[in-house]
């Protein structure tokens, strides 16, 4: 069974490598840099899923991203809202990554991107606008805090997309001692979402995706 899954993943990966984008060279450059410098960016599977959700939900115009990294996921999402006069607000705590993302955004053909440098646990509260889509991919131990603060800004019918919710698989297999607190918080966060929200799903895509819709 595991061998079949591996073969299936390799097949899927070969297909989604045929990615089309006006910023294709830049995207490839960011992917290469992330691999060399060990920068955490979204997987190709998540990239495709994000694109699909945003592309097919025409009401998504304003997006909040918690965790910019070097701008990879921001570019992917922003491309899908350009013809809607949409806007991306993206928060990053690391100054070096913030600057790299800034450079990457400037190299792209994209408009309507607002970067914020700071701790999302503080910066989200300062935002005075609402969003149709929220993407969370930052410090795993703070996921519940990020969610609670940003959900207040989510428009009716909006979606929260939480990436890496399975945290390298440590939620269902033995984890190193240094990760025990994060694993416990993530496990409790998943229970919290299922207990308090009706439109919730947990999907085994890449390192796990949690979706919450505001109905």
Where are the language model's segments positioned?
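A short alpha-helical cap/connector motif
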Residues: 1-133, 140-161, 165-215
């Amino acid at each position: 069974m595991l061998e079949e899954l591996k073969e299936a993943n390799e097949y899927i990966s070969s297909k989604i490598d045929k990615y089309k984008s006006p910023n294709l060279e830049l995207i490839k450059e960011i992917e290469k840099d992330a691999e060399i410098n060990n920068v955490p960016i979204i997987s190709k599977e998540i990239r495709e899923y994000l694109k699909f959700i945003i592309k097919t939900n025409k009401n998504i115009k304003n997006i909040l991203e918690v965790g910019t990294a070097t701008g990879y996921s921001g570019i992917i999402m922003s491309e899908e809202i350009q013809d809607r006069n949409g806007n991306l607000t993206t928060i990053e705590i690391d100054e070096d990554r913030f600057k790299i993302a800034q450079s990457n955004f400037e190299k792209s053909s994209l408009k309507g991107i607002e970067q914020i440098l700071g701790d999302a646990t503080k910066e989200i509260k300062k935002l005075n606008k609402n969003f149709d889509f929220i993407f969370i991919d930052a410090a795993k131990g703070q996921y519940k805090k990020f969610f609670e603060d940003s959900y207040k800004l989510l428009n009716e019918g909006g979606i929260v997309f939480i990436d890496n919710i399975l945290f390298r698989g440590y939620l269902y297999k033995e984890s190193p001692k240094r990760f025990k607190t994060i694993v416990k918080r993530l496990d409790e966060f998943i229970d919290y979402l299922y207990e308090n929200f009706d439109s919730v799903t947990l999907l085994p895509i890449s390192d796990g995706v949690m979706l919450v819709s505001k109905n």
